[in-house]
Amino acid sequence: QSAKSSISEDIAIIKKTFEKQGVGIIRTVPGAAGGVIFVPKIKREQALAAAEKLKEQMNDASRLLPGGYIYLSDLLAKPDVLHDLGKMIASAYEDKKIDAVMTVATKGVPIAQTVANYLNVPFVIVRRDSKITEGSTVSINYVSGSSSRVEKMELSKRTLASGSNVLIVDDFLKAGGTINGMRSLIQEFDSTTAGAVVFCESGVSNHNVTDYSSIIK
């Protein structure tokens, strides 16, 4: 059985090394129920380099799709891309006491799941059509920013606890209607939105959403 002083010294060495290399930070929680928590982090220069690499991969006219969308499926299927995105977003919100990560089906799921994994919190999936296996749901109507149509999104009542601090994560922002819809849905659960982050956004200048971050613009 190791002495407490020896363990403390080892933790101090690991903490210093991780912070120096930009791997993450080590937090200690005192008390009988405490312990050691590892929080992934990424240095600013590493994040900028990863974002620039992604931007280069996306700088291809063949990715442009009808309706102003961008083809992202191949990138979001790569573990290294998800690793970088997840770490960048989680690093920005690791001190915001996030309770859950929310996204809308389906393309945003891999990113949201990776972010939730790094933050060690649940992730919830909002759907436009509920499944019978989800039980009772809460639904809201929202205005699609790109088409100005009224659409619906739903979330299982058991998925999100009241009073949660929720981080919204999605793959693409066109006009902002989907993010606004998720914010309204979060309010229906008596919860708050900690922030909204998207992988990339369209070149449209008149987005209908504010207070969001984009990895690639």
Where are these regions (language model features)?
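Key DNA-contact positions within bacterial/archaeal DNA-binding proteins
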Residues: 5-9
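DNA major-groove recognition helix of helix-turn-helix
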Residues: 10-11, 18
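Minor-groove-contacting beta-hairpin "wing" of winged helix-turn-helix DNA-binding domains
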Residues: 24-39
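Active-site-facing substrate-recognition patch
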Residues: 37-97
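Short glycine-rich phosphate-binding loop at a beta-alpha junction
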Residues: 98-105
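Short, glycine/charge-rich flexible loops or terminal/linker lids adjacent to PRPP-binding catalytic cores
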Residues: 121-166
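Acidic, divalent-metal-coordinating active-site segment for phosphoryl/phosphodiester hydrolysis
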Residues: 170-180
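PRPP-dependent phosphoribosyltransferase catalytic core
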Residues: 184-217
